A protein has these predicted regions:
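Conserved acidic carboxylate
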Residues: 11
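The feature encodes the CheY-like receiver
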Residues: 17, 59, 77, 89, ...
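Charged docking surfaces used in two-component/phosphorelay signaling
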Residues: 18-26
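Acidic, metal-coordinating helix/loop segments flanking the phosphotransfer/catalytic sites
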Residues: 33-51
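Active-site residues of response regulator receiver
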Residues: 55, 85
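C-terminal output helix
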Residues: 109-119
Length: 128
C-alpha cells in the first residue's frame, strides 16, 4: 500500500485551517496544521511533509520568509510550496514565486481548483 502523502497547512485562521484539513483528509491526505510561521518552519524541518500550504500573513514569521528558508535548505528544498493567501496583488504573487513558491492561489478560493492544484504538485514529475 502506498504511503499517505503528508501536507503541512500553515494557516493562522482556524476556520480556514479546519476547512482545508477536512477536505484534504477526505481525499486521503495526512495533515498537520501550523498556526504561525516559526512552527511551520520547524514542522517542515522535523517532519519533511510532501507539500506545504503556506499563508503569507502568519504570526512570528512571514510566509515569504518561511518559503525562502525552506527552499534554501538542502533538506527541504524539494518540498513543493503552495501559497494560499488573501494577498492578491501581482507584486505579492511575483515575490512568492521569487521566494521559490511552486504555486500561488488567492483567497477566497474554490476547493475543487485547490485540490486539483495540490494533486498536480504532488505528482512525481513535479518533485525534485
Amino acid at each position: 500500500m502506498p504511503k499517505l502523502k503528508t501536507i503541512l497547512i500553515a494557516e493562522d485562521e482556524p476556520d480556514t485551517a479546519n476547512l482545508l484539513q477536512f477536505h484534504l483528509q477526505r481525499r486521503g491526505y495526512h495533515t498537520t496544521v501550523a498556526s504561525d510561521g516559526v512552527n511551520a518552519l520547524n514542522l517542515s524541518f522535523e517532519r519533511r511533509p510532501d507539500l506545504v500550504i503556506l499563508d503569507l500573513m502568519l504570526p512570528k514569521l512571514h510566509g515569504f520568509e518561511v518559503c525562502r528558508m525552506l527552499k534554501a535548505s538542502p533538506s527541504t528544498c524539494h518540498i513543493p510550496v503552495f501559497m494560499l493567501t488573501a494577498a492578491a496583488s501581482t507584486e505579492n504573487k511575483v515575490e512568492g514565486f521569487r521566494m521559490g513558491a511552486n504555486d500561488y492561489m488567492t483567497k477566497p478560493f474554490a476547493m475543487p481548483e485547490l485540490l486539483a492544484r495540490i494533486e498536480l504538485l504532488l505528482q512525481p514529475s513535479h518533485g525534485s
